[in-house]
């Protein structure tokens, strides 16, 4: 059975379960981070063509996505950082946050002839501006330029949490926005902006979601807590996601997983929706989230450079959709 046929069958069943005849006239608005944008747009196009609700998706930073939910200007949002308790308290309608997929965060670089393997201390020294020449990393001498996110980003939050976990020498703290050293560094907006900046500039290196690596931008192998050097891929990132323990709000992280074979920098991606006050859009919102968590949709995640959820985490995510109410 084709994916489109499976999706059509799924939405037919969801329509019956929700007591409605179809979702064809349902239109939902969403915003979210750039990391999974291609995946979500692909999902939403298939949903609409298979009898599901139509969903618009605009790429913004994680802070902007969460702010849109707080301001109640969207039906749901997508973030690569969970909402903090102080922000959850600002949403009177309540929030459900549901892990949908995961991602590795790579050290992407453009330095031909260099097969880069970084210890955890080197990761920290690089990102804090203490390495400025490629010869310090065992490569041919040349100026090194650090590329960082200019926008407020969950990727930056997850990345800096890992840097802090890697070494007590990390001096910049953690968060979605960091004051990076200005020397030998340039800023770029979004994962795509970081990828473009690295690709255009020989000698550049920065952090970005694995799904945005392309062209001349390669991923460094990073030392994990077990002492192994792992490149970011489906297998090594999936092992790292297993180390994440979710709390009662389904938030969680593992900034330096100890599992053998695990890539050391990963994050989850969450859908943030309202617990109540969804009105006539309730069935469509539930159907959209049920679709994202379906085996059919999850089977497409890896094709776009992200990490599908394994059975244990799916078993925690799927029941939460039922908390979304009118």
Pin down the residues of each PLM region.
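Bacterial N-terminal signal peptides that target proteins for export
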Residues: 1-9
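Flexible loop/hinge segments at secondary-structure junctions
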Residues: 23-326
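C-terminal segment of classical bacterial N-terminal signal peptides
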Residues: 14-22
């Amino acid at each position: 059975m084709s994916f489109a046929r499976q999706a059509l069958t799924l939405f037919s069943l969801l329509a019956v379960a929700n007591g409605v005849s179809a979702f064809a006239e349902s239109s939902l608005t969403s915003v979210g981070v750039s990391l999974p944008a291609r995946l979500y747009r692909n999902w939403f196009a298939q949903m609409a063509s298979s009898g599901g609700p139509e969903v618009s998706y605009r790429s913004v930073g994680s802070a902007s996505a969460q702010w849109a939910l707080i301001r109640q200007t969207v039906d749901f949002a997508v973030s690569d950082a969970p909402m903090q308790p102080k922000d959850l308290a600002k949403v009177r309608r309540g929030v459900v946050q549901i892990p949908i997929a995961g991602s590795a965060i790579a050290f992407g670089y453009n330095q031909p002839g260099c097969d880069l393997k970084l210890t955890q201390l080197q990761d920290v020294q690089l990102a804090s501006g203490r390495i400025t020449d490629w010869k310090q990393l065992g490569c041919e001498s040349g100026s090194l330029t650090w590329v960082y996110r200019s926008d407020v980003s969950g990727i930056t939050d997850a990345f800096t949490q890992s840097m802090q976990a890697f070494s007590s020498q990390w001096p910049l703290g953690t968060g979605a926005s960091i004051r990076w050293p200005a020397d030998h560094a340039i800023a770029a907006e979004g994962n795509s902006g970081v990828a473009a900046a690295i690709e255009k500039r020989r000698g550049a290196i920065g952090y970005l979601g694995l799904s945005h690596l392309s062209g001349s931008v390669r991923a460094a192998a990073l030392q994990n807590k077990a002492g192994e050097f792992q490149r970011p891929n489906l297998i090594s990132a999936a092992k790292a996601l297993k180390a994440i323990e979710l709390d009662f709000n389904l938030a969680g992280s593992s900034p330096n997983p100890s599992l053998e074979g695990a890539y050391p920098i990963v994050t989850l991606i969450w859908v943030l929706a309202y617990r109540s006050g969804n009105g006539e859009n309730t069935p469509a919102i539930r159907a959209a989230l049920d679709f994202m968590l379906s085996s059919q949709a999850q089977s497409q995640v890896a094709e776009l450079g992200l990490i599908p959820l394994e059975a244990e985490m799916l078993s925690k995510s799927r029941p939460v959709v039922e908390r979304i109410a009118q």
